[in-house]
Regions:
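N-terminal beta-alpha supersecondary unit
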Residues: 1-20, 211-221
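Phosphate-handling active-site elements
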Residues: 14-25, 49-67, 190-203
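Short pre-catalytic strand/loop immediately N-terminal to key active-site residues, enriched for Gly-Thr
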Residues: 22-35, 174-175, 210
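DPxDG-like acidic metal-binding loop motif
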Residues: 34-62, 76
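Glycine-rich beta-strand-to-loop/alpha-helix junction loops that act as flexible
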Residues: 38-39, 177-182
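Conserved, helical-rich catalytic subdomain that frames metal- and/or nucleotide-binding sites
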Residues: 79, 84-174, 187-202, 206, ...
Length: 225
């Protein structure tokens, strides 16, 4: 009952007073506690899918408002486009970013998001960032660092291990932790071919998982919302 998929289905059913139910099968490919928004994207997918299956015809904004009740990241996945997000996830603005390739590493350990935000060492004094300022720079600029990374590294030392491992494989690369961790990522230089990337992934320590992914400007399910 606490799974976001189940909560999303129940929330939509209550909100619309829909009389029937649905059978939902979930196959998770994104590790839990990885900082990749796997649970939030699952919840968004359920809202999108059941909205169509049940012929509810709720608008994107209605679904996003419902999604916010499930978590701050859910509206982003319902928004379906590359976005600059503010507030508690309710203010989103489309931005244009290159569809770069990224190497994402899961260091075999999960981190509970609540542990990060409950940590006494978490600082909340980062200078505000505007959209124009962000777009005028590159995401790898140090001023756009992940404020959760130092805390996550103390809770889960594997985060720093993964960042150090990336530095060994791709020196001078701009690497970061994703979300609240524990995954880390790095933009893959365009000069690297598939064979070279495969060679890097073969060096992963036991228990780690690595994937080559590509940034998207739009969610494949965007037109379903």
């Amino acid at each position: 009952e606490n799974d976001l998929v189940v909560r999303a289905a129940h929330l939509l059913k209550r909100h619309t007073a829909y009389p029937f139910g649905a059978s939902i099968a979930l196959k998770k490919n994104i590790p839990m506690g990885a900082g990749l928004g796997g649970g939030s994207s699952d919840a968004a997918s359920v809202l999108i899918g059941l909205n169509r299956l049940w012929d509810l015809n709720l608008s994107q904004s209605e679904l996003m408002n419902l999604g916010l009740e499930l978590g701050a990241d859910v509206p982003f996945f319902l928004f379906g486009q590359t976005a600059f997000v503010q507030g508690i996830g309710e203010h989103l603005e489309v931005i244009e970013l290159p569809e770069d390739q990224f190497l994402v590493i899961f260091p075999g350990k999960s981190i509970a998001t609540k542990d990060i935000f409950q940590a006494e060492t978490l600082t909340r004094n980062h200078a505000p960032i505007t959209i124009s300022h962000f777009l005028a720079s590159h995401w790898s600029d140090p001023q756009f660092g992940n404020d959760l990374q130092p805390v996550a590294s103390m809770i889960c030392p594997e985060v720093n291990r993964a960042l150090d491992w990336i530095s060994q494989q791709l020196p001078n690369s701009a690497k970061r932790m994703s979300g609240s961790g524990s995954c880390v990522f790095v933009a893959v230089p365009k000069v690297l071919g598939t064979n070279e990337i495969d060679h890097i992934l073969q060096k992963l320590p036991s228990g780690w998982v690595g994937r080559l992914v590509r940034g998207l400007k739009q969610n494949p399910a965007y037109n379903s919302v």
